[in-house]
């Protein structure tokens, strides 16, 4: 619906998809903490990254019917915007990890921080293979974000037991 009135519908998607970070933190701790808010914003940055890639698949077709998206807004500058979203994602998720794991051991903190770091490498791989005119490639990159999300979860799970 947002793509009918804004060039940034991916922000609305991010707001909806990532609210679980706020909910889970509050359910677990009994209060909303700043690491959850930072994780939420980092999740929105990640949504902007992967859904801009996805939106490039049909950017030419949706232009014909007047639908808006970040892919159309950024156009030939999409790679630079994706780079910014990648950096914001990794930095914000890393900051959230620091806030959430500050009372854990140094080893647990280092392992947990490996999650956003490794996720960043995966997003960089996507960026390196990004071609706005290659629809099958765009689908492959978009779908690889399932793995991008699992990477930090695996690191966090290991850190939890340290």
Residue positions per predicted region:
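Multi-pass alpha-helical membrane architecture of UbiA-family
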Residues: 1-162
């Amino acid at each position: 619906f947002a793509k009918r009135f804004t060039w940034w519908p991916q922000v609305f998607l991010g707001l909806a998809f990532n609210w679980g970070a706020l909910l889970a933190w509050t359910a677990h701790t009994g209060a909303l903490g700043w690491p959850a808010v930072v994780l939420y914003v980092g999740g929105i940055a990640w949504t902007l990254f992967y859904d801009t890639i996805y939106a490039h698949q049909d950017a030419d077709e949706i232009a014909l019917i007047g639908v808006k998206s970040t892919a159309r807004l950024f156009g030939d500058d999409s790679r630079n915007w994706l780079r910014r979203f990648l950096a914001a994602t990794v930095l914000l998720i890393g900051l959230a990890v620091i806030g959430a794991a500050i009372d854990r051991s140094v080893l647990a903190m280092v392992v947990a921080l490996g999650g956003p770091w490794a996720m960043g490498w995966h997003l960089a791989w996507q960026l390196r293979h990004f071609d706005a005119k290659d629809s099958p490639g765009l689908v492959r990159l978009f779908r690889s974000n399932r793995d991008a999300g699992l990477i930090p979860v695996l690191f966090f799970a290991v850190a939890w037991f340290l």
